[in-house]
Amino acid sequence: MAPLLPIRTLPLILILLALLSPGAADFNISSLSGLLSPALTESLLVALPPCHLTGGNATLMVRRANDSKVVTSSFVVPPCRGRRELVSVVDSGAGFTVTRLSAYQVTNLVPGTKFYISYLVKKGTATESSREIPMSTLPRRNMESIGLGMARTGGMVVITVLLSVAMFLLVLGFIIALALGSRK
């Protein structure tokens, strides 16, 4: 009887099994492209690891571009409730919408800097890692360059003065009413 697999293909099959094993599987993360801006001045919003890693110990690694120092942050991957979307509508009505953001916020970053972000998640004996994605924080803007628009217009000053005078007259009338009421 002939062997089922030739001896030469066995090493190739073992290599393929090692590469495709669950412990070596990579997953993708994103920079929350569904948001108006996932980048803030001193922080970034990063999508959470996939749902099949719920309960695993995640380590978020942040590396500054052109630097070898890696800053890590650890947390437990939160459970998924249905399909995990980056921004999901929780309640909507009466002219407002309540949303829930499923993301991890990386804080204390340098403004206007490019970073490379990746996850390493350990769940049981399996370890999965994400591919490294580039993200940049927003540059800090000069305070004088921010337009205030209607900061102190003439109409606002007039309304404030009128309200102040009306409040003074109201308090004065209340005091006079108390004084005249106690004479009887």
Swiss-Prot record:
Residues 177-184 are cytoplasmic. Pfam families: Uroplakin_II. Residues 26-84 form a propeptide. Residues 1-25 form the signal peptide. Expressed in ureter. It is a single-pass type I membrane protein. InterPro entries: Uroplakin-2. Keywords: Cell membrane, Cleavage on pair of basic residues, Glycoprotein, Membrane, Signal, Transmembrane, Transmembrane helix. GO terms for biological process: epithelial cell differentiation. The chain crosses the membrane at residues 156-176. It is found in: Cell membrane. Glycans are attached at N28, N57, N66. Belongs to the uroplakin-2 family. Interacts with uroplakin-1a (UPK1A). This is Uroplakin-2. The lineage of its organism: Eukaryota, Metazoa, Chordata, Craniata, Vertebrata.
